[in-house]
Amino acid sequence: EARAKLVSEAISELDQFLVDIEMDIRSDQGIFKDLKKQGEAIDIKEVKPTLEKFVSREAMLFLNHDLSKEEQDQASVRLYQEWEEYREKIFDRFVSSGYWNDEERAVVKDTILSPTVDSLTSQLLVSAITLSAATVFDMGKFTLLYDIYRLADDDEVKVRALLGWLLVSTNCGCYEQHPDFRSFAEQLTEDCKNDSDLL
């Protein structure tokens, strides 16, 4: 039993290593090179606080009565452009990312499920995770999509995560024999029966 556990852990570590290597190879060419370059400045742990600051700054802007309507509009346009550029960098960072450890996955999940992060941003991040996992299969991102599907209150985010999970599952035929894959597939089948109104 101890030996089987050791072998399982070694295989898991090898999988993580291979995910990083394959993503590094892809990031040396084509569009992934650009995505990695544009997203490399993003710290995953700072994504949620930074997105929340944008919301706070927007609220404060409209509460600032010292500014004229025109000044507020100009400041709002600048803030929106800054916010869009930041979202684009997050997307690039997520798509070109390698293996995420448990802490990073928890931070990403918390960000996507946060009520202070708008639905469109959460959907964008789910799409980025989907593209990353569909390009280089990563069991951690695969299960993260499933967790987001299960836990999201926002139906749009929930459906995006489910579709992402299904897309990734069709791209990872070699993992169909993986015990985790089978258990997730069985659980998802049950969940879809309960959430048939979403489909």
Regions found by a protein language model. Give the residues of each.
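Extended, helix-rich scaffolding/adaptor regions
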Residues: E1-K69, Q81-E85
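The canonical alpha-helical register within tetratricopeptide repeats
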Residues: E9, Q16, L144-L151, F184
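Alpha-helical solenoid repeat scaffolds
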Residues: E9-Q16, F32-K37, Q123-I129, V159-T170, ...
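Short secondary-structure junctions and interdomain/linker hinges
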Residues: I21, D28, S132, D191-D195
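Alpha-helical solenoid scaffolds in large eukaryotic transport, assembly, and signaling factors
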Residues: E46-A152, K158, G164, V168-Q177
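Long alpha-helical HEAT/HEAT-like repeat alpha-solenoid scaffolds in very large eukaryotic proteins
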Residues: H178-L199
